[in-house]
Amino acid sequence: MKDRLIGFIKTYCLFVCIFVLQKPLFMLFYKSLYPDASCADWFSVIWHGLPLDLSLAGYLTAIPGFLFITSVWTLSKSLYRIWCSYFLFISVLISIIFTVDLGLYEYWGFRLDATPLFYFFSSPKDAVASVSIWMVLGGIVAMAVYAVVLYAVFYGILLQKKLLLRMKLPYRRLKVSGILLLMTGLLFIPIRGGFTVSTMNVGKVYFSAEQRLNHAAINPAFSLMESLAKQKDFSKQYRFMEAAEADRLFKDMLEPAVAGGQTEKTDSVQQSADSLHTLFNTQRPDVLFVILESFSSRLMTALGGEPNIAIHLDSLSKEGVLFTNFYANSFRTDRGLVAILSGYPAQPTTSIMKYPRKTQSIPAIAGSLRKAGYGTKYYYGGDADFTNMRSYLMSSGFEDIVSDQDFPVTERLSKWGAHDHLVFNRLLEDLKTEAAEGTAEEKTPYFRVLQTSSSHEPFEVPFRRLENDRLNAFAYTDSCAGDFVRLGSLSRTYRQFVGRTLPDTSVDGGRCHPRAEAH
């Protein structure tokens, strides 16, 4: 049994080591992209990319795990041939994926996914038309060499007959089989990515505001596998009219000057920014977005909703500007966030946040404000890796993300992580610290986003004002927002602060209302 357990562990660790070594190889191959990368950057790429490596190694070790179980009952030559064939196939597969990824990244700007396969199978001739014959031959040679090297490593460490012959048929076969089955089952933990609400996804490795470092941390084989699992034909879902008809209708909605390609501005408001009305007393205010989980107009008396629920927001609506024609963009947080922060409409059957290759290209308010000199930070008490949220936030321009891992374990008591009052308190303490560290003249304006999570199933909150658990959870989040504004108003920087509260989605107590009522 000892030899089988050691062989199982060696197999898993060997896969992990191969994937880890691919990261510095990628960075060396594209050394022109990383001329100023420090040693810390190199180690950060390896460290943050490790979750995907551990997950993929788990997938690839599952079959050897069952082969080890089979070896408890038979040590036939057929089993040895199956063993060798599996690792030969894996060697070729890893070699093809890694080599193709190296070759295409220069042109595509993202790590390998299903896109090249789509183009190749749609039209193989056109797919390779822009590639010289020497590049194709060079790629094939590189694949072959890498596959041979990988198989030699597998053979030398795992497949030598003398190593396999050391294994004997055990006396307690059921016991040994049970232990090996348990070990194989434990691979589910790295495959899934732990026990949090989020499962393993490419976005989990995003850690830097520099996309080149995030891309280097991605495991291309995992990226390809995830992309194939999510492959959809979007053209069949959303192609409602011919392109010419769509262009004609869109052109009619544009201003004449824009539609005609003119550059001079004819409107008096367009000519001078000074003519625009403003509600601010400073040109570069600090900006805070508070994104309220599942809130709707039905919770606010000011918007015609039920009384005595969101009493603090009702009060604030009389002091600030109330938008009465603001509508929820979707019914899921991952879709609503992209609509709020990037102005990207939600799709009915999918979420763009789950496609890091797409989200890295869409504009976002965080990126625009960062270019304007703002410091950007995102606060969320839950798991920032849920539905690829981390990759979207880092790509969109947020320099730092505060999530559940930044709170003590004793404060992560809800299903979704830290309760809302703890997240608001963390934000308030950070703002006080930043205000104390610099003078008003040298202070960098900030853009902060706080996303709540307590007003979500199972609606368990450390607060009791209403009998209904669901409504009480909304009242709790409302009280957290009210306390934050009350305490924040005591700060000396409050006059330079612009706050905006809005919901991510609209969930209205299970009742269905016309879309026009889903504020």
What are these regions (language model features)?
Residues K2-L14, S78-V92, R173-V176:
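Alpha-helical transmembrane segments and their helix-start/interface "positive-inside/aromatic belt" motifs
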Residues C17, V176-P190:
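Hydrophobic membrane-insertion alpha-helices, especially the h-region
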Residues Q22-L52, W83-M143, Q160-M167, R192-F222:
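Membrane-interfacial interhelical loops
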Residues S55-F68, I140-G156:
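Hydrophobic cores of alpha-helical transmembrane segments in multi-pass inner/ER membrane proteins
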Residues T74, V145-I179:
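Cytosolic-side transmembrane helix boundary signature
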Residues Y119, S123-A129, T184-V269, D274:
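Membrane-interface segments at or immediately adjacent to transmembrane helices
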Residues E255-H519:
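Solvent-exposed soluble domains appended to multi-pass membrane proteins
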